[in-house]
């Protein structure tokens, strides 16, 4: 593919740096930064930022998306739920990094993620015994963890239904995944809750829509890791 005129660059979210590309030592796969943004909650009228989220995509994701979305503007992508659903269901791996801006316990952090995932799966009729068991494994993975500012959770979402979890004291990818959960509905729900219909990070959705048109139209060139 021809390189983009405006290459993909790193993104800064508060004090968190998301590099333009990363390679996982656990899988040896490389990914480019599709977008990044903040996640927070409005508490007593004030927006409190808790996490910076980054979505990394495999190069071949570009080809699967370009067939339908090449030539679309950023606004057209932002306005289309199907665009984000196509990212989620694309036949390639996605790697999601969630780095903490404020201290959170593993129980606090995972509780909200699980609530959102279960709500989505129930709304789409994909929540059953297997998904309940997968949620149990997810909860157990976070049970004894604490996340100080700057620490990270990495989610590897594979097209065959694996959800790999890694935990890091900073922004570096661990050599090995802490746990792999085999459940496609949960794997896709994690990213759906971040960029789908009821996205916890509208900032991340906007960033994806702003950055990906150049890649879809002209190809991929990374710069400034």
From Swiss-Prot:
Gene3D superfamilies: 1.10.890.20, 3.50.70.10. Pathway: Secondary metabolite biosynthesis; flavonoid biosynthesis. The record marks 109 as: Important for catalytic activity. Pfam families: Chalcone. It catalyses: a chalcone = a flavanone. Its EC number is 5.5.1.6. Substrate binds at residues 51, 116, 193. InterPro entries: CFI, Chalcone_isomerase, Chalcone_isomerase_3-sand, Chalcone_isomerase_bundle_sf, Chalcone_isomerase_sf. Keywords: Flavonoid biosynthesis, Isomerase. Part of the biosynthetic pathway for all classes of flavonoids, a large class of secondary plant metabolites, many of which are brightly colored. Catalyzes the intramolecular cyclization of bicyclic chalcones into tricyclic (S)-flavanones. Responsible for the isomerization of 4,2',4',6'-tetrahydroxychalcone (also termed chalcone) into naringenin. PANTHER family: CHALCONE--FLAVANONE ISOMERASE 1A, CHALCONE--FLAVONONE ISOMERASE 1-RELATED. This is Chalcone--flavanone isomerase 3. It comes from Lotus japonicus.
């Amino acid at each position: 593919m021809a390189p983009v005129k405006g290459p993909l660059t790193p993104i800064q979210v508060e004090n968190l740096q998301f590099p333009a590309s990363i390679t996982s030592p656990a899988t040896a796969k490389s990914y480019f930064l599709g977008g990044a943004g903040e996640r927070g909650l409005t508490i007593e009228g004030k927006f409190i930022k808790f996490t910076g989220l980054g979505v990394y995509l495999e190069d071949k994701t570009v080809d699967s998306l370009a067939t339908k979305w090449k030539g679309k503007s950023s606004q057209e992508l932002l306005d289309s739920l199907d665009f984000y659903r196509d990212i989620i269901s694309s036949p390639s791996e996605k790697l999601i990094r969630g780095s903490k801006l404020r201290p959170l316990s593993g129980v606090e952090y995972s509780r909200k993620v699980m609530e959102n995932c279960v709500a989505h799966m129930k709304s789409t009729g994909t929540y059953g015994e297997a998904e309940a068991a997968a949620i149990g494994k997810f909860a157990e993975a976070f049970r004894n963890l604490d996340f100080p500012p700057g620490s990270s959770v990495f989610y590897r979402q594979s097209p065959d239904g694996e959800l790999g979890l890694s935990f890091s004291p900073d922004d570096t990818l661990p050599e090995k995944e802490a746990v792999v959960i085999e459940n496609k509905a949960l794997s896709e729900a994690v990213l759906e809750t971040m960029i789908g219909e009821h996205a916890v990070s509208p900032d991340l959705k906007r960033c994806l829509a702003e950055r990906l048109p150049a890649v879809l139209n002209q190809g991929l060139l990374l710069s400034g890791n």
